Amino acid sequence: NKAFGDTANHSQSNTNPGYANFDWVTNENATDNTIKLKEAYWLYTKERLFGADIPWAASVGRRPSTDGLPINIRNDQQPNSPLSHTVDVEFDGFSVRLDTENLTGFTGSWFKICGGRGLTNAKPRFDMSGAAYAEDDDKNVDIDMLGFIAVPYDNGQYSVHMNYARAWNLVGFDGQSLNSFNTAYGAYSAAPSSSTEYDLQKATPEFKDVGDIDFATVLFKTEGIGNGISNYLDNSIAFASFAASKTKPNDKGMLGSTDSETGTSVWLGVNAPCPILPDSAKIGLEWNKGSKYWRSMTYGEDTYAGSKIATRGQAWEVYRTQKLTDALSFGLSYVYMKYDYTGSNSFFGADGTP
């Protein structure tokens, strides 16, 4: 039994330990010795929709919303949804998928609507502050997301994937609070005392609602490079993905700006059989580049140094993965990120200023 997403009364600043204990990434970060639940959802499938030859499925719960295409290629696993170029976080919500090939005539086409709640504003029970689960006007409002995933074509070798989503009431630190905290932190660092420590505690910023954001992704993937050129190329995978983000700030500003800012990112990758035995091993090379105001929601990406896909600058990765059993794999990876701007892995307020 849990709230959808994080809760509005969850130590709002998340300054210790950073964002690591936020609900979107609670299973991607080692925070304490408790066991977390990553996925638990209800799934219903049926072959016909109101008598029409349209297979469909619906699900509700803590859905598999991390490790989507194409990050799953590096991880050597089946893709979840949505596309991981823009969204790779744990999320509580719903989805409805329609297989549209029989309707449109486009090979392998399907369409999915996804929605969820990333933060729930509700007073807890038995806290003596008012009606249980009532809205708390002193806390952040609900964070919601709604979007779609569409595959207009997939013949098993070549496929096109598209993703659009909007998220409302995203959180971050406002500029004034962040500046006050930085000033207090500087004073404490220069002259530690009970007085400067108290001032630092008072200046600890809290997350505020800073605005909305739009995400869009278009991805092309080929499983097999060419046709019959060689067995090696037939067993290789290549992809190219383009994504964009567009902020819609309120008066507190997003990413350090009160204007709507657009960011873009390109992501290219290739995955091929490792020429060194065993046959189950794969090697890969990936490169991505993000612009000044690029902002992805990829906090759940499994890397040591934050999300490489969020990089405002360029990132390279070389990796090798090997299946040990059907359920266990072993991987080695080298990631290099060259930042052109600050704020790549922050949330959506002044802490994300480039």
Can you describe what each PLM-predicted range is?
Residues 1-129, 143-162, 265-299:
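Outer membrane beta-barrel
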Residues 30-37, 41-46, 56-61, 105, ...:
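Outer-membrane beta-barrel transmembrane strands
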Residues 176-354:
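Outer-membrane beta-barrel pore domains
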